[in-house]
Amino acid sequence: MLRRAVLLMLFLAPFLLGPVGSAKALFESRDDRLGAIRSIGIIVAVGDQFTFAKSGLGTDRSSRSIGIGEWGVDEAIAKQVGELVGRRFQVTPVTWSRSAFFADSGTSPGFSMFRGDRFAKRVQSEVQPQGLDAYIVITKARVDLGAGGRKVDGLGLITFRTLMETYTALHAFYEIRVIDGRSFDVIEEMTAGPLAADLRKNLRLAGPARLYEGSVTAVTDAGDAGLHRAILDLIAQSLPMTLESMHLR
């Protein structure tokens, strides 16, 4: 029985550790691995689209999206993250294939036992320069909308309709990975959680969100300055808490 268990672990080890994983990852703690990082690159693939969705009684379950590349959301996130982690790490500018990362961003699941983490593979093949100690990768997260298996991701507005009221929530669902720049193991990963204010308002969304008082029907393109400011402010409030929880500050 013991021999079978040992053989099973030896068979599964390459899949559990990833294609380039090593026994080192088994014995080093997350803090040890983060502590060894000096140079770091920041990759962001969140702000290509903004989605409008509805949920609740008698609502149309279809959604619509607008392109928001001109808002510079990814650039704003990269700048803020660089400032927050730059006190601890040497932030090195990197370039990457935006289309490649957006193709995977917001899809689920992120990890396959047999193929490893898809974003770790993207870092290995689509990012320059290679050879940094680690890369911070920020992408869209998917969260449940209600109990029917429906999901939403990234940036957007959700209009909720109940028997008593109708209200709209602005959301910014994202996740952060820290990927080893040599082994391409995922050192740490986290999906951003709700802000304290979200919990008090009982928005029931598993990520950063807040009530939105502006007009939703009037938004037809990316020219809405108020919505632009609101989403950047929501992300700016969430990032410090998320990075702190990941021990990156």
What are these regions (language model features)?
Residues 52-71, 156-161, 207-221:
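A solvent-exposed, charged loop/short amphipathic helix patch at secondary-structure junctions
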Residues 109, 162-165:
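Extracellular/periplasm-exposed beta-strand and loop segments of Gram-negative cell-envelope proteins
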Residues 17-86:
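General N-terminal leader/first-domain-start detector
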Residues 7-18:
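Bacterial N-terminal signal peptides
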Residues 22-50, 142, 153, 164-249:
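C-terminal/domain-edge helix-coil "capping" segments
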Residues 149:
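Active-site microenvironments of hydrolase-like enzyme catalytic domains
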Residues 1-4:
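Positively charged n-region of N-terminal signal peptides that target proteins for export
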Residues 55-146, 173-193:
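N-terminal segment of the mature soluble domain
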